[in-house]
């Protein structure tokens, strides 16, 4: 039993080194090429799928579209969920990571980006960046007095929405024999990787997921993890992962 994860290709705000979170930005031409290459790599390795999952954000949706084009599988069913969205970066969304590191220090930015349970400063009610008034989320209702949609998130918060969705919606499909592809985001996929690999809070801080590169997990029938590998040129995969690690440095 296999599961393939792909982080979306480079987005416009990745290129500009801005905190993105739930801001709905497009792919760059480079990001489109990364997505196409990810699809070609899967096709050359003989992968096929029955079911796809992605987020509400266009950079992931379009990455999936490019992958499916490369596989000649554009007709496959696709399930979209906000629970696979990127981690919400709160009031940091739209800020330059390098400038933020210069202002607050690299260590503080690293804590915001890579710690497990520290959330950035939240958005305030009425901020135009809040998802609560955006058309994409009009079907997502509040639960009681506590809004379902976040104003900010730590990775711990992201795990709390991603993992139940995986366990309740995706894993049963895999167990039934469906071949699943998930295209999502750096932190929503890190949340899932933490769960699948049983990583602790320190280990997950060191994980940098490259853009557009298929990550293949293999499982026994009882869902015991028995294999993990990236598909693609090893040097290219390492270079993309290092580029992610270098974000948020002051120089």
Swiss-Prot record:
Pathway the protein acts in: Carbohydrate degradation; glycolysis; pyruvate from D-glyceraldehyde 3-phosphate: step 3/5
Function: Catalyzes the interconversion of 2-phosphoglycerate and 3-phosphoglycerate.
Catalytic activity: (2R)-2-phosphoglycerate = (2R)-3-phosphoglycerate
Residues marked Transition state stabilizer (site): 185
Pfam families, per database record: His_Phos_1 (PF00300)
UniProt KW keywords: Gluconeogenesis, Glycolysis, Isomerase
PROSITE patterns: PG_MUTASE
Enzyme Commission number, as recorded: 5.4.2.11
Gene Ontology terms: biological process: gluconeogenesis; glycolytic process
GO molecular function: phosphoglycerate mutase activity
Coiled coil stretches, renumbered: none
Record NCBIfam families: pgm_1 (TIGR01258), PRK14115.1 (NF010713)
Annotated catalytic residues: 8, 86
Keyword Mitochondrion set for record: no
Annotated source species: Treponema pallidum (strain Nichols)
Residues binding substrate: 7-14, 20-21, 59, 86-89, 97, 113-114, 186-187
Protein's recorded name: 2,3-bisphosphoglycerate-dependent phosphoglycerate mutase
